[in-house]
Amino acid sequence: MADGEDIQPLVCDNGTGMVKAGFAGDDAPRAVFPSIVGRPRHTGVMVGMGQKDAYVGDEAQSKRGILTLKYPIEHGIVNNWDDMEKIWHHTFYNELRVAPEEHPILLTEAPLNPKANREKMTQIMFETFNAPAMYVAIQAVLSLYASGRTTGIVLDSGDGVSHTVPIYEGYALPHAILRLDLAGRDLTDALMKILTERGYSFTTTAEREIVRDIKEKLCYIALDYEQELETAKTSSSVEKNYELPDGQVITIGSERFRCPEVLYQPSMIGMENAGIHETTYNSIMKCDVDIRKDLYGNIVLSGGTTMFPGIADRMSKEITALAPSSMKIKVVAPPERKYSVWIGGSILASLSTFQQMWIAKAEYDESGPSIVHRKCF
């Protein structure tokens, strides 16, 4: 199958918020764009403008003022396959400019996803795009590859879903994988709400993108939340200005750390779940007592929602409080963690030992979509 050395596999990490795509062996994705499909809210009146019935990614983002934006992936699960096909089509033909029928394709997914989801992914790759071979890998496992470890617990938090995956000597421990449907998009929504309470109105799908930008540029995680609140009350040291697209300037203060605090206190937005620190701890406690020490010493952060300044220190502090007192805790936050899932995929797909792992088109034709459960962990 992969005899021709010139055939570079494609690596496509379909996130809830961003698609990261590129070629195996590269050190960073070539294409990174929002997982958005936009459709016009109004009818076109200018003839010859070349208006389309749908826009994908950055183009949808730039025309967001006149479009209704939809995300085909929610909480890591694809809920609109027609839009998802549009995104993949855009990825291959417009962004990477490749013919998908000429390259093996490595896709990623969140753990504990419905089986039907990966079957449908497999079906579309082989039937719509005629891929010669494909594979579906678990996101967190790829992040561990990227960090150069074979043992550790990965906390992967993106836009739609967070999960903790303990891995020992390269084996994921499925019984200890925990999934938390609390991630970046919920934080954006929380910030929209906080800002609305302050009298700034953000309601449309386009305005949500502005709030996401505010979150990414200005939010941080407090080491001590209560103390930070006190500081914010008495001094203006935490205040920052942000200029909206129309030139209006808004000032944001305690919102900067109140928004991402939700990761540690989901009850702030009415969720009953444990925070990311407890989830990580619970995941470790579900593992064999003999390997916990290795997991505590290798807590690897990955995904865009782990990009908040202060997250590693706070994580370290919270886990230290939960763990046995003599335990050595180490939280690893690689600088490239925003793309570490993709980077891990790039490493995996270019390993010579991986080449027999691909699901070939012939195997798919023989067994159908369910082959994905036999061939991919």
UniProtKB/Swiss-Prot annotation:
Record localization: Cytoplasm, Cytoskeleton
Other comments on record: There are 8 actin genes in A.thaliana.
Any one GO molecular function term: structural constituent of cytoskeleton
EC assignment: 3.6.4.-
Catalytic activity: ATP + H2O = ADP + phosphate + H(+)
The protein, known as: Actin-1
Entry-linked Gene3D superfamilies: 3.30.420.40, Actin, Chain A, domain 4
Gene from which the chain derives: ACT1
